[in-house]
């Protein structure tokens, strides 16, 4: 017999007037846990910042999670951290919403809805294009729904943003550069070796070219991987919009050793 899934009842808590929220401990993914039917979750990225897997539902969400692991201003990220119930719009009483991600930035927490640009702004359809008309109308409804969500979070004094693949590539990092960092983020170092890198950066005024940093780890098979692995740890940062090379400038991050 198939194993029966454990059902978890939502325990709503007050968020603000007209808005309730349901959360689990440690920001565990609420939607997947509650229903047990999120069968379109396609994978999980092992986040070095979180030291565990962060679930994603498709390419654009995976892109967001990977970028979150690389940008300095993102400290931690959780998938589907809460569900809110809105009773502030009479025609949409009891509307339910679950944000895709909660990110702890240096400046505070932000909830994110991750969407493809064409889901929000599809091309204007021709008169004969019935499928295009359907997508056009669906996008209008989606934008209206997200405006209601933004208003609910605004009333609760919480930050909410919608981000697309365009925004990720423009403000967070070039996808190819992010992928290179993620592909080389598993190199561990001894504390004294790490201290050598941090000390060299401090003594150089906070920045060194990549080749100088690599020279500190000549004894390992891939010195650049050791350096890039320090990015998710927020020990260093680089320009995520330029290809990584010997002359890439490595800056000290926000974590001291």
PLM region descriptions:
Residues 1-257:
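Electrostatic, structured charged patches in enzyme active sites and in nucleic-acid/phosphate-binding
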